From Swiss-Prot:
Record key words, sorted: Aminoacyl-tRNA synthetase, ATP-binding, Cytoplasm, Ligase, Nucleotide-binding, Protein biosynthesis
EC number, as in UniProt: 6.1.1.21
Family classification: Belongs to the class-II aminoacyl-tRNA synthetase family.
Record Pfam families: HGTP_anticodon, tRNA-synt_His
The encoding gene: hisS
NCBIfam families in the record: hisS
UniProt KW Aminoacyl-tRNA synthetase keyword: yes
Localization terms from the record: Cytoplasm
EC primary class: ligase
HAMAP family: His_tRNA_synth
Origin: domain of life: Bacteria
SUPFAM superfamilies: Class II aaRS ABD-related (SSF52954), Class II aaRS and biotin synthetases (SSF55681)
Highest classification ranks of the organism: Bacteria, Pseudomonadati, Campylobacterota, Epsilonproteobacteria, Campylobacterales
Protein's name according to its UniProt entry: Histidine--tRNA ligase
GO molecular function: ATP binding; histidine-tRNA ligase activity
Amino acid sequence: MINALKGMKDLLDKDAYCYEKVIKTCEEVAKNYGFTFINTPHLELCTLFKRSVGESSDIVGKEMYEFIDKGENHVCMRPEGTAGVVRAYIEKKLDKNTSVKRWFYHGSMFRYERPQKGRLREFHQFGVESFGNASVYEDASIILMLVEIFSRLDIKFKLLINSLGCLKCMPKYRENLIHFLDSKEGFCEDCLRRKNLNPIRVLDCKNEHCQSLLNDAPLLNQNLCSSCQKDFEILQSVLKENGVDFEVDSKLVRGLDYYSKTAFEFISDEIGAKAAIAGGGRYDRLIEYLDGKSGFGVGFAMGIERIIAILEQKEEKVQREGIYLCAMDEIYIQKLLHIATNLRKEHKVLLSYEARKLAKHLENADKNNAEIFLCMGENEAQNESLFYKNLAKKEEKMIKISDLKKVL
């Protein structure tokens, strides 16, 4: 038997229902915030991620699915969504005009890492990217969008925020941090590598010993220039005004190299201690990194598998939907196919091609999670009627075929 690859999972039944629910909710909220859909390729040139995600990141260093294709191109399966969207933005020369572009995306991402609960080698993300707006109010709106999504999905969260500063204030902080790191011994190999490539990433290390060494490290948000400080204060003010609880985490850095200024992360204890379920921030430098005109960008990405795990833990019930249409005698099936064809213009209809007893049909309708049950037997056929049962409300009656649209 051929099985799915390790760390890759089929989505069906309850998983598929939860996936559809999450995507539908995210899309509705994103559209309400003025975002439109973008779809980018799963396969990109490796250079895109080496320049955007950064050579010092674990993604590029350890986790990319990369290979040489038949055209001798060094390509990889996308490990994250932002870089591809920025590439599309630049390729279409949208960086050359002054209009704001707001996009949302969803789909598969690929990273070769150890599979665990809520983390797979092929995983799914929903994300948004906003280009051309420098205002911190755009950062706040994107955070509020996530708050609304989690509210609709009934997911409890803790919001962490920080400011990573800008090109004006970061060089001095970087200098202070390197001086601090040089004064300490015992950092892991990853931290030593990051110290030379991008020292701020050392703060992101998950090693407990390294974190203990960082207890008295200089803080990002205490080294901000006046402009970054003002924006960070506005961000906190907006969140408070909108009733959003948050915590300033001075050691929060995004795992990717292109972030600046606003950084945020949503964590949940519903699938394990402090599991990240979404994160993002501002990345004004990324467009320029990828040969675009210097501009502004901010966005987030959400891990769908972790959201599904939370929903399933809550025993999320699959809602009944659609119509189950059936016959007790094979001679009525052709007539029912005609009825089903008309109903399918407005409704989801599952038509059974087998003649069965009423109890068997009802059992099958229940297995298929249908909301409405319609059946034709000899008596119904003679009266141009159908037996109707609402499986959610447990209501049943005889209805005329001519009244079907009105009843449904």
